[in-house]
UniProtKB/Swiss-Prot annotation:
Residues 452-524 form the ACT domain. It is an enzyme of class 1 (oxidoreductase). NAD(+) binds at R149, I150, D169, C229, A230, R231, D255, H278, Q279, G280, A281. Transmembrane segments: none annotated. Keywords: Amino-acid biosynthesis, NAD, Oxidoreductase, Serine biosynthesis. InterPro entries: ACT-like_dom_sf (IPR045865), ACT_dom (IPR002912), ASB_dom_sf (IPR029009), D-2-hydroxyacid_DH (IPR050857), D-isomer_2_OHA_DH_cat_dom (IPR006139), D-isomer_DH_CS (IPR029753), D-isomer_DH_CS1 (IPR029752), D-isomer_DH_NAD-bd (IPR006140). This is D-3-phosphoglycerate dehydrogenase. It comes from Methanocaldococcus jannaschii (strain ATCC 43067 / DSM 2661 / JAL-1 / JCM 10045 / NBRC 100440). One of its GO terms (molecular function) is phosphoglycerate dehydrogenase activity. NCBIfam families: PGDH. GO terms for biological process: L-serine biosynthetic process. The active site is at R231, E260, H278 (proton donor). Pathway: Amino-acid biosynthesis; L-serine biosynthesis; L-serine from 3-phospho-D-glycerate: step 1/3. PROSITE patterns: ACT, D_2_HYDROXYACID_DH_1, D_2_HYDROXYACID_DH_2, D_2_HYDROXYACID_DH_3.
Amino acid sequence: MVKILVTDPLHEDAIKILEEVGEVEVATGLTKEELLEKIKDADVLVVRSGTKVTRDVIEKAEKLKVIGRAGVGVDNIDVEAATEKGIIVVNAPDASSISVAELTMGLMLAAARNIPQATASLKRGEWDRKRFKGIELYGKTLGVIGLGRIGQQVVKRAKAFGMNIIGYDPYIPKEVAESMGVELVDDINELCKRADFITLHVPLTPKTRHIIGREQIALMKKNAIIVNCARGGLIDEKALYEALKEGKIRAAALDVFEEEPPKDNPLLTLDNVIGTPHQGASTEEAQKAAGTIVAEQIKKVLRGELAENVVNMPNIPQEKLGKLKPYMLLAEMLGNIVMQVLDGSVNRVELIYSGELAKEKTDLIKRAFLKGLLSPILLAGINLVNAPIIAKNRNINVVESSTSEEKYGNAIKITAESDKKKFSIVGAIINNKPVILEVDGYEVSFIPEGVLAIIKHIDRPGTIGRVCITLGDYGINIASMQVGRKEPGGESVMLLNLDHTVPEEVIEKIKEIPNIKDVAVINL
């Protein structure tokens, strides 16, 4: 009999599903020692965010086949350790989409009609009908930043209120946005100028941190209302505070903050700020969905079926996985680089295999590449199983081919194009490490780590030096560097490994240097 251990509170409907495939023991509030003891006999472990499934817990698991996370994030699970032991990790990335979208609309309405302030006034015994005059959503323009799962749910609900929708998402094709009834804009500043309401639904990355900053807030209408139910850090809270205090925009409604819980946050002293304590997924329905979705995923895995929400990888023979795994990691890295270099809606990608790879079944490599390609632009839920489906839904045309040319041995070449530019890169595994061998036709031999900068330039004396000086002026250390060129004085490419991420203002400074043609900074 399959033994299923549940160590965090789980909806009763999820328990019933699990009971169809095994003997369920619910043991919440376990100490670390108790968990280490109970995990020995478990075939399945189901957790939420409370249980920490660390490497030592996984190493104690003698029979464990599946770990189920009833929710999205897997920060509390050592996925690498699970993968090493062949344990499949599944989650429920779609469980909270509707709940977050509904909270977004709720906060939007509350801010527009001053509902929290009016409620507080009424409870103080006041009856002030003039002070809390609000505005309608009908006929207003809503700017949606990020048109993924949650953003799309917000669009549906906003349209029901009669709102006009404009969207900013450089990774969504125009025709996909149009099919949702969204006018796609190319520039976030244009969205900020035109929108009466602005809502954010993007992941927090070095690129999206303070995506709404002082410049964007200065462009907003005096009556603008901004809503954030995504991630703290997307908005420059200092700039937002100043604008709200000075009456430059109407209001803000926040479910997330840069520091949680917020300590002495001046935003919470303002009457035109309303908020909730990160309640996006805190609904009965979302909790039920998280439990039942992950329970169904566990059922599929136990029955030998392919589950859609596998976090680490499909259940494949270990011998095959051992051979392909280095190239899967290489492909994922190349995909990550390609998306961040193109920085736009990817239209077409070709994967070209050479050497022994040309004779292999490459489906897993393609899936790994797509996972890497999509990871920089999705909040959560991208994995080897669903990456091809998501790519197809985004109209990304993927072609695979092989070549008898063995210039680099077992190598993967990627050629890709967006609506803005084209890019190609070749990578291989050398001494068990992923190595970049070619960038846009320029030969190099470079091991990318941490933060990678790819800078195209004209090969002129002093150009590289000025780039290095600019980085140094901003306290950004260069760990390693290489230049690829075809001939002296012609177009060249420099690759740099950096110890720190590069702020947008530094990238702009580098672009201003004479002979610099293009700058791309990739966070690996």
